[in-house]
Design a protein with these regions (language model features):
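Jelly-roll (double-stranded beta-helix
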Residues: 1-191
Length: 191
């Protein structure tokens, strides 16, 4: 369903496939992978399917709409909980070239991706299809450029882990030995 969120935590292993069905028009989506810390890599997998009506929204007086997928914005909490990275995940649709301040926890790394129109982020122009890494700070200022179209972006922030990352195919672990064990488990039907 348009506007839905699928949130999967792979943990010790999760085999899945995605086969979205398109009725008409253009279908698109965002796929985001968030690393787990070493202590959580072998947790049981879990899956959450969140329909659009269960994603809270904040609407400002000037018509800006903020969908709160994870974390908290303007005292509204998103439906995703219990994630070690303590993510902030917002879908922001700016109304009428308006400006919006978004607080970012000082403990988090963050990025923004403009998926419609173009926006200014802390004074820098970001065009459609561009992703920007955000520097440290307590907040960013987002401003739309157009009064005739919807300038939109996703903003994601999360607490970084000071741990090594080893990746091979679909596996992400902390050591080469853990990768070898994950491959062994997958080949032997243990996930």
């Amino acid at each position: 369903e348009a506007g839905s969120v699928q949130w999967m935590t792979a943990g010790k292993g999760l085999v899945h496939s995605e086969m979205p069905e398109q009725e008409n028009g253009l279908m698109w989506g965002v796929q985001l992978w968030i690393n787990l810390p070493a202590k959580s890599k072998m947790m049981p997998p879990r899956y959450q399917d969140i329909p659009p009506q269960n994603i809270p929204e904040v609407e400002t007086l000037d018509g800006t709409l903020i969908r709160v997928i994870a974390g908290t914005f303007s005292n509204v909490e998103g439906p995703i909980h219990g994630i070690d990275a303590e993510p902030l995940y917002l879908d922001v649709r700016l109304g009428n070239a308006t400006s919006l301040e978004i607080p970012i926890p000082s403990t988090h790394s963050a990025f923004a991706y403009c998926y419609e129109g173009e926006v200014y982020i802390s004074g820098n122009l970001v065009e459609k299809g561009k992703l920007v890494s955000l520097s440290e700070g307590d907040y960013i200022t987002v401003q739309g450029c157009s009064v005739s179209s919807q300038d939109s972006l996703i903003l994601v922030a999360g607490k970084p882990f000071d741990e090594p990352i080893v990746r091979y195919g679909p596996f992400v672990m902390n050591t080469k030995e853990e990768i070898q064990q994950a491959i062994h488990d997958a080949q032997n039907g243990l996930i």
